[in-house]
Amino acid sequence: MTNFKFTLLARSIAFALNASTAYAAQPTNQPTNQPTNQPTNQPTNQPTNQPTNQDSNLSEQLEQINVSGSTETINVKEKKVGETQISAKKLAKQQASDSRDLVRYETGITVVETGRTGASGYAVRGVDENRVGIMVDGLRQAETLSSQGFKELFEGYGNFNNTRNNIEIENVKTATITKGADSLKSGSGALGGSVIFETKDARDYLIDKDYYVSYKRGYQTMNNQNLKTLTLAGRSKKFDILVVDTTRDGHEIENYDYKIYPNKQADLSAVGPTREKADPYQITRQSTLIKLGFQPNENHRLSVALDDSTLETKGMDLSYAFRPYSQADKEIYGERIINDQSKRKNIQFSYENFSQTPFWDHIKLSYSSQKITNKARSDEYCHQSTCNGVSNPQGLHLVEEKGVYKIVDKDNKDFNYQEDKNNPWSYGKELYNSKNEKISNDVDTEGGALDSVLINCEKLNCEKKKFPIYKEKDEEWKDKYEHEDRDITIKELNGKKYGEISLKKSDSSGFTKYESARFLFPKSFGYSTDFVNDRDLNTNTQQIKLDLDKEFHLWHAQHQLKYGGLYEKTLKSMVNHQYNTAANVQWWADYFFCKKPVNGNRIPAPDHSAYRCKLMNSDIGKDTYLIPVTTKNNVLYFGDNVQLTSWLGLDLNYRYDHVKYLPSYDKNIPVPNGLITGLFKKFKSTDYVYGNKYLVPKGYTNCTYTTDCYKQNFEENLALLLRKTDYKHHSYNLGLNLDPTNWLRVQLKYANGFRAPTSDEIYMTFKHPQFSIQPNTDLKAETSKTKEVAFTFYKNSSYITLNAFQNDYRNFIDLVEVGERPIEEGSVVRYPFHQNQNRDRARVRGIEIASRLEMGDLLEKLQRFPLGYKFTYQKGRIKDNGLHPKYKEFLELNKDEHPEYEAIARKPQPMNALQPTTSVYNIGYDAPSQKWGVDMYITNVAAKKAKDSFNSQWTSMVARKEKIYDTESTVPAKKANGKEVKDSRGLWRNNRYTVIDTIAYWKPIKNLTFTAGVYNLTNKKYLTWDSARSVRHLGTINRVETATGKGLNRLYAPGRNYRMSVQFEF
C-alpha cells in the first residue's frame, strides 16, 4: 500500500514540477519520507523511489542477481540479465555459511581457491580476484597483491595471506552479483563483474513492532563448524538499534576419503606434497555488526554503524614442500605451524534527508573508515621429542624432593660416576644411570659449569631450596666424582629473580683455584629454533560519499534520476617481520640460562641458553618489499532510468573516476636498500660495491653497504621510484528495454569497465641473480566492454530468459621478461629482469539461461511447486599482440628438434578463470501453511576440456634444450600424472560430475524453525575446476607430486555431508 501511495505522490510532484509550481513543505505523514519502520534501501522488488510505471525499473535490473532480505519472489519486470539478487532469507534457507555457498547454486560465477588461505574473491567471465569488484556497504574491499612477480616470488611459499577478505554471511541483507563490466557501481576492478553486499539494518526487522530477538545455532559436518548467532533489534521513540553477533568455530573442510589414514600417528606422519588428507587447521570467525539510528522526524535520519570481524586460521602445513632439514634426525620435511588472520573493521556515519526539493527526493551523506589487515604468520621448527635441538634419550627430568631440586633419569633415579672398565683408553670416570648403563654420550659432562649457568627463579621457586651439583674435582683439584646439595643464592636483575650457585675456591697454594662442578643437562640446546615469518598486508580506506535521487516527468517521459560523487583515500602497505625465537622449549632451557662472559666478566644473559650459551632469540627488525602507496580516488556519477512509453525504456548511466597513486617511504619500515640501489641510476664502473670494505682495489671508490656513496645512490634511485601516477576513466552503462507484447521483454546492454594497476604492479622492485623485477610507472589501465542481448518470455510468475553476451578485455597486465641488464655501469654481472607491461587482449563469448516455472500456472493443484533451471556456457581466449617475449630464447633453442613448440607458443591462450559448462536444476515445495518445505538442487558441471586449459610452466616441463649461464643442455620431459608433458595444456582438470543437495525446513510453532540438509546426497567423488587450477607447479604450498598425481586427493570436494540449524525468534 505504501508503494501505491508513493506512486500517486510521485505523479503529483512530477506534474507540479512540469507546471512550474512551487514546492510546498512536505507533510510529516508522507510515505516517501520513509517512516522509522521502513528501511532506507528497500528490497529490489520494492524500491524506495518506486517508478510510476513498473517497466521503468527494468533496465536497472539488467545483468544483476540480487539477494534481498524480504522476499524470494522475482518480479520479471524488474529482472536484469546476468544479474542475480540473493536474499538473506534465501541464504538462511540454503544454510549458506561462506562465499562458496553464496554462489553454490549460481552459474557463471565461482570462488577462487587458494588452499590454506581459503577463498580469494570470485571468478566471472574469464577473469578473477582483483578483476571482479567486491563491495560491502559501498566500500571496496581489500585487493590482493596481483603482480605476477609477487606471486612468483612470495605467494607460492605461504608467507603472505594474499587473499581478498570475505564477509560474514549472517550480516548480509542483500548480495548483488553482476556479470559483465560493472565499473559504474564498483569503480576500478570490476572488469568481469562485481559482488556487492548490503548489511542488515534494524528497520528490516522492525516493520510492525518495536523489538526483535533471534538466536540461531547451526552445525555442519564437512568442517565440524558450530554456528552461534544472536540478533537483537529494538526501537524506542526516535532511536533504533541492531546488534548481530556471530561466532563460527570449526576446522578444515574434509575432502573425500578424509579418513584415509588409520590413526593419528599415520596422519601426522603423512607430510609433504603427497599427503592425501587436508591439512589440519582450526578455523574461527568472530563477527559483530552494530547499527544505531536516530530519526528525530520523518525527514531526517542520522546513523552510525560498526562492522567488526576477525577470521583466524591456526594449524599445521603438513603438505608443506620444504622444511628445515637440520632440525631433526631424518626429516625430509620439517614442520610449519601457521596462524593466519583476516581482520576487517568499518565505522560508518551517515545522514539522510527525505524532504523533496527540486533537486532531490532523497539525499544521503556518509563517511566511512575501514581497516583491513590480512596477516600470515608461520613458525617453522621441529616440535617433536626426537628433534636434535631437544634430544634427551635418557629422559632426564627435574623433580623436587624435600626442598631439593634433583635431575634424575627416566626411572626417577640418580646418576653415579664409575670407571669405564670396557674402555682402557677412558680418562677419568664416566656417568652411569641406576641400571648401570653408561650415559655419558647422552649427557653434557663438559658444559654446564656452575660459573656459566644461572637458575630462573621466576619459574622455579628458589626460596630455601637446594640443588645437587656434580663435582668432578674439589677446590684443591682432587678427584671427587660425586654430587653435592648446594644452597641457591637469590639475586635480582631488572626486577627479575635468578639463582646462583658459586664455585668453591681455594687460595692455599698462593693462587686461586676453583673446583670443577657443573649441572648435568641433556646434550642438546633444550629448544628448537623457530624461524618466524610474520607478514601483514594492510588496506586502510577513508571515504566520503554523497548520493541523491530524484523522480520526475519531463516531456511525457518518466525519469528516475540518481547522481552523486565520492572521495576515497586508501593506504596500502606491507609489514614484514622475520625473526628467530625458541620453541618446543624443554626444562633445561626454560629453568636455566647462561651467565655470559663479557670483557673478562660474566653477566646474566636470560636470552642465552644454558647449553653452550647460545642466543635463543634474534630479530632483524621490520621491513617491507613494497613501498607504501596512498590511492586517492575522485568520482562523479549520473544515472537516469527513462521510461519513454509503456513499451520503451532507456538506461543512461555514466561515471568518471580519477585515480591518483602517491607513493611514499617509511624509514621505520624500510625497503631493503639492495632492492633499490642501482635500479635506475647505476653505480659507476669505478665504484666498489660488492665485497669486503677493507679490501677496496686501488683506483676504486668504496661504495659498500654502509658508505655515504651507497646511501647517496639509494636516495637518488628512491627519488626516481617515488613517481606519482594517475588514471582517468569514463565508465558508462547503456541499456534499452523493449516490451512489444505482454509476454516478451527484449533487453540490450552496452557497458564498459576498467582496472587501474595495483600499487605493487607499478612500484614493486626486486633484484636477484635468477629473478629481478623492474618497476613500471607507465602502465595503462586494463579495460573491458560488455555487449549483451536478452529475451525474456514470461507469464504470471513463470519465465525463461535467454541471454547472449560478449566481453572484450584490453591492456591485460602481464609480467614480461625484458632481458638481462647490468647492475652497475660496465659490469659483466647481469641480472635477468622482468617488468609488468600491458600486452594481452581477450574475448569471452557465451550464453546463459535462467528460468523458473511455477507449476501452479499450469495446474492449480500444483501451487507452490516451482521448478528452476540455470545454464551457462562460455568460451574465451587471450590473444597476445605478437609472440610473447618469454618464448623467444626457448623457441630459438628448440626450433630444430621441436618445431611444434612455436605453434603452441603463438596460438591464443585459454583462460583458466572460465568455468566449465554448468547447469543447475531446482525443484521445491512450500506447504500452504508455510510450516514446512523442501528444495532439491541438482548441479551438473562438464569436464574442463584440455584445449581450454593452460599450464603457464609448460616451457620448463616439456622435452627441451635450455641455456644456463651460456651452457646449453638437453632436458627430458617431466611427467604429470604418469604421462610426459608435451604441450601447454593444464596438468590437472576436473571430470564431469553431478551433485545433488536436498534441504528442508520445519516450523512447528511460529517462533521456531528447524532447517536440515544433505549435501552431495549420492556421495559423489569430484574435483572442482577451481580446486584443480589452484595446484601450484612452483613454491611450497598447495603442491602435489606432479609425476604421479599423489596428493591431489586432498583437494577433492567433501563427500556426503550434513547441515542443520535451529532458530528461535520473537
UniProtKB/Swiss-Prot annotation:
Signal sequence bounds: 1-24
Entry GO CC: cell outer membrane
Annotated ranges, domain TBDR beta-barrel: 208-1066
Sequence repeat placement: 26-29, 30-33, 34-37, 38-41, 42-45, 46-49, 50-53
Alphabetical list of Gene3D superfamilies matching this protein: TonB-dependent receptor, beta-barrel domain, TonB-dependent receptor, plug domain
Keyword line: Cell outer membrane, Membrane, Receptor, Repeat, Signal, TonB box, Transmembrane, Transmembrane beta strand, Transport
Region annotation 7 X 4 AA tandem repeats of Q-P-T-N: where it falls in the sequence: 26-53
Summary of the function given for this chain in its UniProt record: Acts as a receptor for hemoglobin or the hemoglobin/haptoglobin complex of the human host and is required for heme uptake.
Extra remark beyond the main annotation: This protein is subject to phase-variable expression associated with alteration in the length of the CCAA repeat region. This mechanism is called slipped-strand mispairing. Addition or loss of CCAA repeat units would change the reading frame and result in introduction of stop codons downstream of the repeat region. This may be a mechanism of regulation and a way to avoid the immunological response of the host.
Protein name: Hemoglobin and hemoglobin-haptoglobin-binding protein C
Record organism: Haemophilus influenzae
